[in-house]
UniProtKB/Swiss-Prot annotation:
Transmembrane regions: none
Protein name: Basic phospholipase A2 3
Organism: Laticauda semifasciata (Black-banded sea krait)
Keyword field contains Hydrolase: yes
EC number: 3.1.1.4
């Protein structure tokens, strides 16, 4: 679910950047999404949005689905073996890892999406 996603983000980036920094970034990080992603980090969010869309097609509720994960010393892992929990955790895990390896550009935080996301 979205709360667990914030914890996975923190785990994947070793607490270097608070998860709220990703809530209003670029064209796809946060609610909604349109246009062309502004950078690599924004592409991570678009992929995550698409993954949630696929989960919904499977009958899952990704924003609400609780799952089991482990925040290890190397990187987080998903513990569920089947179903929506496994799929949604995988969506969140891949996005969190993508965030951790992608540069963060302060200029792409809280942008005017009506102008830059066409």
């Amino acid at each position: 679910n979205l709360v667990q996603f914030t914890y996975l983000i923190q785990c994947a980036n070793s607490g270097k950047r608070a998860s709220y920094h990703y809530a209003d970034y670029g064209c796809y990080c946060g609610a909604g999404g349109s246009g062309t992603p502004v950078d690599e980090l924004d592409r991570c969010c678009k992929i995550h949005d698409n993954c949630y869309g696929e989960a919904e097609k499977m009958g899952c509720y990704p924003k609400l689905t609780m799952y089991n994960y482990y925040c290890g010393t190397q990187s987080p892992t998903c513990d569920d073996k089947t179903g929506c929990q496994r799929y949604v955790c995988a969506c969140d895990l891949e996005a969190a890892k993508c965030f951790a390896r992608s540069p963060y550009n302060n200029k792409n935080y809280n942008i005017d999406t009506s102008k830059r996301c066409k």
